[in-house]
């Protein structure tokens, strides 16, 4: 058995075709929670939900966000009310004292629901209401996620990286902002000066995550800084990865990134925005899968294939390369 680390869309796209390569029925997916926000009192977990919706075959695969065919009537009414009341429709980050009040899991990422700067679908909202209500009843985020997975018919463990708060904050030339404000509202346009994973020094991986990371690990072609970075910022996860076989898929072709702001984020965090930089950022990776057009010399075992991901056939091809990388390490995986 293998365990996948998932953040953003890279790993879900990889798992899109994994069923014919790995025994995915029992394959845990450990998800980034640094992107999570509390929006209008609801705890929203974008990376967790992308994995849940993909596994339930309900994901909007055009955007790789939200539920396919969902409506947005509540969101549109929130925007209309804000306009009618002449309220600022940009992200409304709550005052500092509010950021550490209320449920701990939402620390440093609380936004007002006025105008709702992130588009939340109506069916999607039901998931967030259920999650938040379970948390308020005393459930851990891991337990709430397991309940949602069961309700959606997901047959493999979907594990938040921690039940403790970790918030990804981007230091920009326009100020320090949460990742969702940087990515959704500001369209990743501000100059990046650095990245902070607030709370990571005190956060612990859950017992379920520790158990999952005892198996060989696959890191998909996700953003090394904001998708995988919050996870490896946890001392317990970083140590676990150093003690288990890890194969990572590069999100770059040499110095060209497939999508998103990974290049700017890596440069701001002190890494070359390239496959070579990914290797430096992942000292715990034992082998890599890189694109067939990528001639970057790496000092660890490397398998080359077409790493473009968009269909189940693409995911299957790259997963077979991942399996080959484990074979080269002498690691048997189911």
Curated annotation (Swiss-Prot):
Q: Name one GO biological process term.
A: F420-0 metabolic process
Q: Which cofactor does it need?
A: Mg(2+)
Give the catalytic activity.
(2S)-lactyl-2-diphospho-5'-guanosine + 7,8-didemethyl-8-hydroxy-5-deazariboflavin = oxidized coenzyme F420-0 + GMP + H(+)
What superkingdom does the record give? Archaea
Q: Which EC number applies?
A: 2.7.8.28
> What pathway does the UniProt record associate with this protein?
Cofactor biosynthesis; coenzyme F420 biosynthesis
Sorted alphabetically, the keyword list is: Magnesium, Transferase
Which parts of the sequence bind 7,8-didemethyl-8-hydroxy-5-deazariboflavin? 49
| Record-linked InterPro entries | CofD, CofD-like_dom_sf, FbiA/CofD
Q: Which Pfam families match?
A: CofD
Disulfide bond positions: none
Q: What class of enzyme is it?
A: transferase
In alphabetical order, the GO MF annotations are: LPPG:FO 2-phospho-L-lactate transferase activity; magnesium ion binding
Query: What's the subunit arrangement here?
Result: Homodimer.
User: Do you know which PANTHER family this protein is assigned to?
Assistant: 2-PHOSPHO-L-LACTATE TRANSFERASE
For this chain, the family text in UniProt reads: Belongs to the CofD family.
User: What does the UniProt function comment say about this protein?
Assistant: Catalyzes the transfer of the 2-phospholactate moiety from (2S)-lactyl-2-diphospho-5'-guanosine to 7,8-didemethyl-8-hydroxy-5-deazariboflavin (FO) with the formation of oxidized coenzyme F420-0 and GMP.
Q: What is this protein called?
A: 2-phospho-L-lactate transferase
This protein's species is Natronomonas pharaonis (strain ATCC 35678 / DSM 2160 / CIP 103997 / JCM 8858 / NBRC 14720 / NCIMB 2260 / Gabara)
